[in-house]
Every structure is written in C-alpha cells, then in structure tokens.
C-alpha cells in the first residue's frame, strides 16, 4: 500500500502543488521568493558540504516558518551544549522563517527542496545527516521516505493534532499511517496528541512515541530572562496600556468599535496597535482611522524610536519587537482568532498579561491552558472584549490573579527542550 501512496503523491499530488505554486508566483511575492529559493537549495548545500572537513556530525532541522523555528531554537541550543562541534542545517518552507531567522547557532540555512523523491533523496545523500528533525506539523512524505531508505533516522517533536483532525478520516489515515510509521521517533506535546498518533499508527510501527511537551515555552522563558530584570514591577505599576497584537482585518472589524469605547471611557488608557502585516497601506489605514476619531497617533518604526510616554495610540510599524513591548502593557489582545487561528499567546503570558483572543484557538494547547487557569479568555464579539477589559481595568482584584495565572502557564511547562534533546541523542 505504501507504494500506491508513493505513486499518488509523487506523480499526482506534488505536480499539482507545483503547478498551483507556479500560477501563484504571479500574484504572491512570498510564493515567488520561496519557489525561487527551493531551486537553489541543493547548490547551497553542496557549497556548504564542500567547505567541511568531512568528519563533522550534521543535524538537519526543518521548520515551516518563524513560529516553528521558535520551537526549534531551544532544541538546537541544547543540542549544541551536548555536542558543541555538531553542525546545524535548518530548512524552511516559508519566507517568514527564511528571511527573518539569522541565528549564529545555524551553520547552513536553506529553503526546503521541492518534495520530489529524486530531489530530496539527492539532498539527503549529499548531506548524510546524523538525524533529520521536524518541528511540529510540517512533514513532507518523500523527505521522510527517502531518509528511511537511506537509513537516516527521522524525528518529529512538538507534534500536535487538531481535535477533529482530517488525518484520521479512513482513506486519509491510511496515507498518513504510511508517513508517520517511517519516523524513528515522535515526541508529542500532549497526551491527547499521543492518542491521536496511536490511532494513526495502529500499533503496527516501530516508531518510538513519547509525550515531551512544547519547547517553545523554553524559548519564551529564555527570551524573557534576558530583560526581565528591567521589568520586575507588577502590572499594576505599569502604564495603563493595552497591547493589541498581530491584528488581522477580521480582528479589526470585530473589535475596533470596542477599542474606541475603551479609550473614551478610560482617559488614562493608551494602546499599542500592532497590525499582523505592517505594510505601508495597512499602517496608513490604521493611522487614518484613529485620526478620524480624534486621536493623535504616533508610529513606532525603524526610523521612529519607541517612546513609552507617547499619546493614547501608538501604531507599530516594525516586526520582531512584540516580546519586549508586552512588558510595557497590562492586558493583551492577540489577533488571528477570527481568521486563520490565534498567534503567539506565550509571549504576553510570560510578561504577566491577562490575554484575550478570538474563538479560533482550539488547536493551541497553550490557549486552552490559559483559559482553564483564568489567565486568558476567548471572545466571540466586540462587546465581550469591552466587558472583559473594562472589568479588568476597573477592579485590581481581578487583574492580579489573571496576571499570575497567565505567567504560571509558562513556568509549569518549561523543560521540554531538554527532554527533546535527550530523546534525539538517546532514541
């Protein structure tokens, strides 16, 4: 049956994906950049390998995008501590990872080659890594099957599955069964993920499966530790500021009127407004909307420094600063929950902020933990956002327990990176 699925994937699915990608490059710059980068990946690998002595141990990590790399980074750092002379290759699927990750712990960075069997087998044969390691969900069947044929152990960590995952549908499950069973080791985030995986494997695999947690908690904690000493004060000692982070158009349509109402009702309140895509048209539209309501707006960009004493509304036109900005707020709203799914809620949690987000959070274990602990809330409409934030702003006895509950979610989940590194080395 595996050969049947190989034929379907290699000669039907992948060609269709490539055709769609070739059409999409005329409309989407990210697709264009990604596809162009994939055609050069083998050349980059060959040049890198030719510069090595020949006896180095190489570990190849794959992360779909920036978010998955943030799960991967603490694992790479932990592996480097144990094996300081190991070489690290990291492949990315998305330009958001490739373009924004510049880390000294990475020895070679590439776009993931197109998942044609001949292409990925050639790349693996060239590199011959000790292990091929995937982060979270972005797995590519031919890459896994080729590694298995070349006897290169494959590892999947921070594996997670949607509650109603389509991977367990009868025909689809049979396909993914033949993909996942070729992994050497799989480390899931939760016991529920472990149970989904067991249903897929059907006890017919030699794959080692363990529940080891999510290393992204370790990354968030490690990042916060670098500047926490500057921000040891309670949320009640900070400026009364709400961080509206990673805002999509769908978020704006739902919450914008409620945000204005909060600003009108609380004179000392200020906000940081952080669009998900900080392109010029989005930034200018945000500025114009707040100006039309009578609010002076300052912009935080590469050219304009951030001033904590800025007026009521600050629009953020720069990426990579949210983890720091959260420490200047007392409450956070994290976007994406009215469209594709919520963004990173761990960073505001470690900054001790009560967190609100939209209804699409079910596939994010950390969001569920925040809700269960009292550190976060899902809202379905703008009125719910207003009521919850208004309650927190009006009653200090509500905001402090929520603040402590949010940060406790992070602290009780750290340590996964160490467990994953141990598994990579020992399993």
Residues covered by each model-derived region:
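Donor nucleotide-activated moiety binding/catalytic core segment of transferases
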Residues: 216, 298-340, 344-345
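Active-site and donor-binding regions of nucleotide-sugar-utilizing enzymes
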Residues: 21, 25-226, 247-249, 262, ...
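Conserved catalytic-core segment of nucleotide-activated headgroup transferases in glycan assembly
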Residues: 68-82, 221-303
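Nucleotide-activated donor-binding/catalytic signature segment of Leloir-type glycosyltransferases, i.e.
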Residues: 101, 106-109, 284-316
């Amino acid at each position: 049956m595996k050969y049947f699925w190989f034929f379907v994937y290699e000669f039907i699915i992948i060609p269709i994906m490539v055709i769609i990608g070739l059409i999409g490059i005329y409309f989407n710059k990210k697709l264009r950049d990604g596809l162009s980068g994939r055609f050069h990946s083998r050349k980059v690998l060959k040049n890198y390998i030719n510069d090595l002595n020949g006896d180095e141990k190489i570990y190849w990590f794959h992360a779909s995008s920036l978010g998955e790399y943030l799960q991967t980074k603490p694992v790479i750092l932990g592996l480097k501590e144990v094996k300081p002379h190991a070489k690290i290759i990291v492949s990315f699927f998305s330009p958001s990872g490739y373009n924004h990750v510049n880390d000294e712990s990475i020895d070679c960075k590439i776009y993931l080659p197109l998942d044609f069997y001949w292409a990925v087998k050639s790349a693996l044969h060239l590199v011959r890594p000790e292990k091929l390691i995937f982060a979270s969900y972005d797995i590519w069947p031919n890459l896994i099957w080729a590694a298995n044929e070349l006897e290169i152990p494959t590892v999947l960590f921070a594996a997670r599955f949607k509650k109603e995952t389509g991977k367990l549908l009868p025909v689809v499950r049979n396909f993914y069964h033949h993909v996942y069973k070729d992994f050497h080791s799989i480390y899931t985030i939760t016991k529920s993920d472990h149970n989904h995986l067991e249903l897929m494997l059907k006890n017919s695999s030699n794959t080692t499966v363990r529940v080891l947690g999510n290393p992204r908690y370790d990354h968030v904690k490690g990042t916060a530790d670098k500047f926490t000493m500057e921000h040891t004060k309670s949320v009640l000692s900070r400026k009364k500021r709400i961080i509206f982070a990673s805002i999509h158009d769908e978020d704006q349509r739902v919450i914008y009127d409620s945000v204005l109402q909060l600003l009108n009702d609380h004179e000392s309140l200020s906000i940081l407004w952080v669009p998900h895509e900080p392109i010029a048209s989005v930034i200018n539209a945000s500025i114009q909307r707040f100006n039309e309501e009578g609010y002076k707006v300052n912009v935080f960009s590469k050219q304009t420094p951030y001033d904590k004493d800025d007026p009521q509304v600050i629009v953020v036109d720069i990426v990579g600063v949210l983890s720091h900005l959260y420490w200047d707020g007392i409450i956070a709203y994290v976007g994406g929950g009215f469209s594709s799914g919520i963004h990173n809620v761990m960073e505001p949690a470690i900054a001790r902020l009560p967190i609100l987000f939209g209804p699409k959070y079910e596939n994010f274990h950390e969001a569920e933990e925040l809700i269960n602990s009292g550190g976060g809330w899902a809202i379905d409409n703008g009125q719910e956002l207003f009521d919850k934030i208004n309650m927190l702003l009006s009653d200090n006895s509500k905001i402090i327990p929520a603040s402590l509950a949010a940060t406790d979610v992070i602290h009780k989940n750290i340590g996964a990176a160490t467990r994953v590194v141990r598994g990579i080395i020992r399993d």
